[in-house]
């Protein structure tokens, strides 16, 4: 029986569930950053140890993205998503009992593996349910749940951490995904089945690098690596960097909230522009605008400019990144998109491991918040050059 587009109610239910999964992922990813001003002194972590703990979560994301993208193309989207949500919920909950850098790093590594496995699967589901002329908007709408979840984590931190301690945010972030599992089991339809056993499926090397895709794949990995280096540096360290400017923990949580709200708006706006204008102009323009935002953030010392510039940084950074999630898979055949997205995200996660480690090292060397922000400007501009070449040279592979 031929595949047909899912009818509107089924697609809406699937997209809503994917949005909720992305929201819970965003909450979990941001939780460690907004909890850091309390967690680091409570566990007696040095800046270097904190960077290693943050990096462990990113390492889990790398492994999860590679495994999740490969498995999603073979075992089906729904079983993989349920497994991933269960893993990141369970080990986020386990973070509550962490007593030092080793146990904390282990739990963040395993939670990151679950988070990483979910991400390429969400992209594949969004591409399946979206009309061809709304693919980028559908993908960015779904992924706007991640910064929305990050904003909720920042609000949670501002309202509850001082009263209930750093454990409370991981308790909430672990229980909620586990509660979502029975809802997914009942309401989420099975996605596109894996190819029949007799169908010829290309090997990983052929799928990623064959038929003239070598340049696109390398550029995609490079762009994702540098962009996610900056993203996860900010997600993990922005609250602490702002607090170090003399604006306190509340100022740090406010900056994280502004960053995530700007990210949600950027996902919607830049995703819409990509569908209307094509990917080149919106994505190419976003990177220099992001560099200017970080340059301004480095010099800002009062709360209002910090909030505005953090919001602008989120707008351009996440707007460009999540639009690329919707654009890059289209450069590959449909049967290989889960693998392609997973490989690109995994390459990005290698960069994301470096972001927290670099920030911890620079702070330990006395660079201060302004120096860390300024160090990210050339990284952003390099990613922008790679994204420009990729969107100019890339071609739609068809379904």
For the regions a protein language model found, what residue spans apply to each?
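Extracytoplasmic gate region of multi-pass secondary transporters
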Residues: 32-33, 212-268
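Helix-loop-helix hairpin linking two adjacent transmembrane segments in secondary transporters
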Residues: 142-186
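C-terminal membrane-cytosol helix-exit motif in multi-pass small-molecule transporters
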Residues: 175-194, 383-391
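Paired small-residue
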Residues: 87, 91, 102-111, 304-312
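Cytoplasmic helix-loop-helix junction between adjacent transmembrane helices
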Residues: 107-144
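Conserved MFS/SLC helix-loop-helix module at the cytosolic interface between two early adjacent transmembrane helices
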Residues: 63-101
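C-terminal transmembrane helical hairpin of 12-TM major facilitator-type secondary transporters
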Residues: 274-327
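Helix-breaking motifs and short loop linkers at transmembrane-helix boundaries and internal kinks
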Residues: 44, 76, 97-103, 131, ...
